[in-house]
Amino acid sequence: MAYTTEIVTVGTVALEHYLPAQETANRKILFVHSSGHGSWMWKNFLSYFAERGYDSWAINFRGHHLSEPVKDWETVGVNEYLEDMENALQRIGGKVIVVGHSMSGLLILKYAESHQVAGLIVSQSGIPKSLMQKKGIALPGPMSGKGKREITAGAIIPIKDRELVKAMLFDRGNVDEETVDLVLKMMGKESARVGGEIMQMELTPEKITAPVYVLGFDARKIGMELPVDLNKVLAEELKAKDYKVIEPGGHNYMLEHNWQDFAQQFEVWVNAQ
């Protein structure tokens, strides 16, 4: 199905909108990006769902990609991103499935504690520090060497080492070099404050009434040595009925060769809601 695209601005935040020629699905979809990324990371999924009649959107948090730059990253915390999400969802309207990846997985869960959404897809999220401690999971130490992130003026600086980006974000042999070029070009700064606040953030699962689909991941692929899949722990805490491990696939599976396999999995779940 044909579709049109546009950039919709809500305050200082920009949304990418893929509008199908005929909206045949009874749910809209909002894709939320991960740390240092933007709506561009969801380009394949946006076109996939728009072609199938879904009114599809992707947000850029303040200071990211198409949104207005942030003057002071130290003023940007979790509450600011939750405000961006609320403004975006008010603009979109209707019944919306919200997809969060990595950093934004916990953000969309926190949002859903106090807002109604049609469903939540939580992809390769972290879990709160308190839940790790409750389950007796040892926290990994900070990364060293090339993997250590530089922080300047409250902002986490994006990694520009090509081989490190490939190792951390993609499965070996599952991504073309043009996609790696895109990621290196497009990755931007992230709020260090948000990263710290997310780790300390508490979730109240009983407040989340929307159906939840949790997608797990082998954290060793991004240099984290953990005894369990954190997303399985999260799914159990949320009492989520739907849980699946993304495999084969790297952290940025939505940009890998087999991205369509996962888009189809999303579609099956969305259609069941």
What residues fall within each predicted segment?
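Active-site glycine-rich loops that stabilize anionic/oxyanionic intermediates
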Residues: S34-G38, S102
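Flexible "cap/lid" loop of the alpha/beta hydrolase fold
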Residues: L120-T152, V194-G195
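Gly/Ala-rich beta-loop-alpha elbow adjacent to hydrolase catalytic centers
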Residues: V99-S104, I108
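Short beta-strand/loop motif that positions the catalytic acidic residue
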Residues: I208, V214-G216
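Conserved loop-alpha-helix segment in the C-terminal half of the alpha/beta-hydrolase fold
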Residues: G216-G249
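Catalytic histidine-centered segment of alpha/beta-hydrolase-like enzymes
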Residues: G249-Q260
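Active-site loop/oxyanion-hole signature of alpha/beta-hydrolase fold enzymes
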Residues: H64-V96
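Conserved alpha/beta-hydrolase
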Residues: L46-V70
